[in-house]
Swiss-Prot record:
It comes from Salmonella newport (strain SL254). This is Carnitinyl-CoA dehydratase. The gene is caiD. Keywords: Lyase. HAMAP family: CaiD. It catalyses: (R)-carnitinyl-CoA = crotonobetainyl-CoA + H2O. The keyword Protein biosynthesis does not apply. Belongs to the enoyl-CoA hydratase/isomerase family. One of its GO terms (biological process) is carnitine metabolic process. The active site is at residues 111, 131. It is an enzyme of class 4 (lyase). SUPFAM superfamilies: ClpP/crotonase. Pathway: Amine and polyamine metabolism; carnitine metabolism. The keyword Lyase applies. InterPro entries: Carnitinyl_CoA_dehydratase (IPR022852), ClpP/crotonase-like_dom_sf (IPR029045), Enoyl-CoA_hyd/isom_CS (IPR018376), Enoyl-CoA_hydra/iso (IPR001753), Enoyl-CoA_hydra_C (IPR014748).
Amino acid sequence: MSESLHLTRNGPILEITLDRPKANAIDAKTSFAMGEAFLNFRDDPELRVAIITGGGEKFFSAGWDLKAAAEGEAPDADFGPGGFAGLTEIFDLDKPVIAAVNGYAFGGGFELALAADFIVCAENASFALPEAKLGIVPDSGGVLRLPKLLPPAIVNEMVMTGRRMSAEEALRWGVVNRVVSQSELMESARELAQQLVNSAPLAIAALKEIYRATSEMPVEEGYRYIRSGVLKHYPSVLHSEDALEGPQAFAEKRAPVWKGR
């Protein structure tokens, strides 16, 4: 594993810390390491939730390492499994990822956060896609994911001028889930992670699968699709031991014990 990436396992929760002073920028080597970490998380049956954060209190990530770019790393370089930052192109990850944004999330750093399922950010966090000012475009998900969250006028301003969005504005628009103080950031992310662990893993996997498959469909078409039998996790949930355990635990006034089957 890269020395720029620190992994910590807390039971079923994996914490990934990007630590590349001064701005936690990501070059191809670091991106490969991040992809390996996320794929291992995906494939490890003991892990349920991942938290990605940045080292320090100023930068979550400034995105692509422009020093590496100046030294010849191309914008379309091979950034490894999972695409840039290891997460932006993993489309079969059925476990939740929380981005704990501790500071500036610019360019690919913002795209990394957008690829997560939840964003918890510190009050000093801000978000921007300044690629157009550098002669490139935010093609690691920024131009694809941001329009699903914001009105076109706001998206156009952000991607064409590089305008920054504060943590509070991001909360108002629903881009982030929570805004907390810097000192409370990881505590808040871990609290959310534990809430996710308390939910049934198969149900979480089915929800992510359904979201991916039906997000662009009309509601009626979505109903037909999820009942067509083509999905992997949804039918499994209906006939799982966990589907029996949930109501049984509720009736017995105890916490459910999920088996993931």
